[in-house]
């Protein structure tokens, strides 16, 4: 009998029932809830006279709509829709007995930063949230993916989900990452290689020596963008890095329960003889600091490259997409990446707002000044605890002295659902995960980069090769 992949093990451990049509019912260990995709789910429970099946399996926080400037209550939120959604989550969690880290709680933050940070996500879990970037949590060897609002209600009511088993893909990144190359560059490079549809229908396991060399924060960055590679879920096998990260966190097992859990978690690796439906091999030496230039995450090139020429693209659909992207972005084929000027910089999001990310940005910002041509640089920690740790290390002072703005936790400029957004025509060096048209504001132009690359663009006023920053 062939060995099992990590995904196979997670699926089999949670399988409740299967149907002949290929659909299945799987048990869900953890649901993470935020203010945008949950109101209708709670209302559905209320109308049906149901209670959550297991209140302790859910944990909630506010992130998408909250301002990143200081506020003391929901009443301080000026946008009516945002204010109502924040208040509604507070009311719903209170009514149904679900833990929420809300306004004024230091644990409040972006869902996919808060949950692992609290140990609310541990290896071996099935994890869902009404948010596509739930895949972030797969870094902890979980089956984690986004669900729709009706499914949020279904999980609340039954602690199960109707799902269809995905195929297995392994992306192996072998070798040593070069100077200035981060987890963000790794995943942008992967997407550049396989495309935004490359992972469609697959659960992606990220493997190889370069992946194992990443911290847990780095692995979360990679799994976060499995979605942009077309997959629904991304994951990394358990190793010592995983175990060390989880140990001692508030929700994590303790004492004898920890010993039993760790013994099980150590089995959460793909067997040596496991069969994958698709295998992608990448040499770490080929990965350079990346910059996205277009309106899809696959439109990405190394920082020392020139922008590609649509005329060289043989696929007519891709060629048309590239031409449209150039028109939207206001760029010219063949221009060096380092000639792209930026108007604003955003360092944050569920992709890159953890303490490691802020340290990398601060290292670049230290002793330097925001370029006069750059209108704004936002640094937004992923949670109150990340903010607290950064301030303990003095990172906030480094950012402020460089002319950057140090903000409160939230999703911020990743998406135009709160006061932080781009104006039409503005170019933004962003550590977020999506560069679609209008994602950061109507007519805004997004360039996806690592925190260090974003900070370097902030001080130079244009993209620079982080490996040559002192010469820029």
From Swiss-Prot:
Name the domain of life this protein comes from. Answer: Bacteria
Query: Pathway, according to UniProt?
Result: Amino-acid biosynthesis; L-leucine biosynthesis; L-leucine from 3-methyl-2-oxobutanoate: step 2/4
InterPro entries linked: 3-IsopropMal_deHydase_lsu, Acnase/IPM_dHydase_lsu_aba_1/3, Acoase/IPM_deHydtase_lsu_aba, Aconitase_4Fe-4S_BS, Aconitase_4Fe-4S_dom, IPM_dehydratase_rel_enz, IPMI_cat
Question: Which cofactors, if any, are listed as required?
Answer: [4Fe-4S] cluster
Top enzyme category: lyase
| Annotated positions binding [4Fe-4S] cluster | 350, 411, 414
**Cofactor note (record):** Binds 1 [4Fe-4S] cluster per subunit.
- UniProt-listed Enzyme Commission number(s): 4.2.1.33
Q: Which UniProt keywords apply?
A: 4Fe-4S, Amino-acid biosynthesis, Branched-chain amino acid biosynthesis, Iron, Iron-sulfur, Leucine biosynthesis, Lyase, Metal-binding
Which molecular-function annotations from GO does this UniProt entry contain? 3-isopropylmalate dehydratase activity; 4 iron, 4 sulfur cluster binding; metal ion binding
* Annotated catalysed reactions: (2R,3S)-3-isopropylmalate = (2S)-2-isopropylmalate
Q: Which Pfam families is this protein grouped with?
A: Aconitase
Q: Name one GO biological process term.
A: L-leucine biosynthetic process
Record's function text:
Catalyzes the isomerization between 2-isopropylmalate and 3-isopropylmalate, via the formation of 2-isopropylmaleate.
Which family does this protein fall into?
A: Belongs to the aconitase/IPM isomerase family. LeuC type 1 subfamily.
User: How the protein assembles, per its UniProt entry?
Assistant: Heterodimer of LeuC and LeuD.
User: Could you tell me what this protein is called?
Assistant: 3-isopropylmalate dehydratase large subunit
Q: Which organism is it from?
A: Alcanivorax borkumensis (strain ATCC 700651 / DSM 11573 / NCIMB 13689 / SK2)
């Amino acid at each position: 009998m062939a060995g099992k992949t990590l995904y196979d093990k997670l699926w089999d451990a949670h399988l409740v029932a299967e149907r002949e049509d290929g659909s299945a019912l799987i048990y869900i260990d953890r649901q993470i809830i935020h203010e945008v995709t949950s109101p209708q789910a709670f209302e559905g429970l209320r109308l049906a006279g149901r209670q959550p099946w297991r209140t302790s399996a859910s944990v909630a926080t506010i992130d998408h709509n909250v301002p990143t400037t200081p506020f003391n209550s929901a009443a301080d939120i000026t946008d009516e829709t945002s204010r109502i959604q924040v208040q509604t989550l507070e009311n719903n969690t209170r009514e149904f007995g679900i833990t929420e880290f809300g306004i004024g709680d230091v644990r409040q933050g972006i869902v996919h930063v808060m949950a692992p940070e609290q140990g609310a996500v541990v290896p071996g879990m099935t994890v869902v949230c009404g948010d596509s970037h739930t895949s972030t949590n797969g870094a902890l060897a979980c089956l984690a993916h986004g669900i729709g609002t009706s499914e949020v209600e279904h999980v609340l009511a039954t602690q199960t989900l109707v799902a269809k088993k995905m195929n297995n893909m392994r992306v192996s990144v072998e070798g040593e990452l070069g100077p200035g190359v981060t987890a963000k560059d790794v995943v942008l490079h992967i997407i550049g290689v396989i495309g935004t549809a490359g992972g469609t229908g697959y659960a992606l396991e990220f493997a190889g020596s370069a992946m194992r060399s990443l911290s847990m924060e780095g692995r979360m960055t990679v799994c976060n963008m499995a979605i942009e590679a077309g997959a629904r879920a991304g994951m990394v096998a358990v190793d010592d890095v995983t175990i060390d990260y989880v140990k001692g966190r508030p929700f994590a097992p303790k004492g004898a329960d920890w010993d039993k859990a760790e013994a099980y978690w150590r089995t959460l690796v793909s067997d040596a003889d496991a069969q994958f439906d698709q295998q992608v091999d990448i040499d770490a030496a080929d990965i350079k600091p990346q910059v996205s230039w277009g309106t899809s995450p696959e439109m990405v090139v190394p920082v020392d490259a020139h922008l590609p020429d649509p005329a060289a693209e043989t696929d007519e659909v891709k060629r048309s997409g590239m031409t449209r992207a150039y028109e939207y972005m206001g760029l010219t084929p063949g221009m060096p990446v380092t000639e792209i000027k930026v108007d604003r910089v955003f360092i944050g999001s569920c992709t890159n707002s953890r303490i490691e990310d802020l340290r990398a940005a601060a290292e670049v910002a230290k002793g330097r000044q925001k370029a006069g041509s750059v209108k704004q640089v936002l640094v937004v920690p992923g949670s109150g605890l990340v903010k607290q740790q950064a301030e303990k290390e003095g990172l906030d002072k480094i950012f402020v002295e460089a002319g950057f703005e140090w903000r409160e936790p939230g999703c911020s400029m990743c998406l135009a659902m709160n006061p932080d957004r781009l104006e039409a025509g503005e170019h933004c060096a962003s550590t977020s995960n999506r560069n679609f048209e209008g994602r950061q504001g109507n007519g805004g132009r997004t360039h996806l980069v690592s925190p260090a690359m974003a900070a370097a663009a902030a001080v130079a006023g244009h993209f620079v090769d982080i490996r040559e920053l002192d010469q820029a």
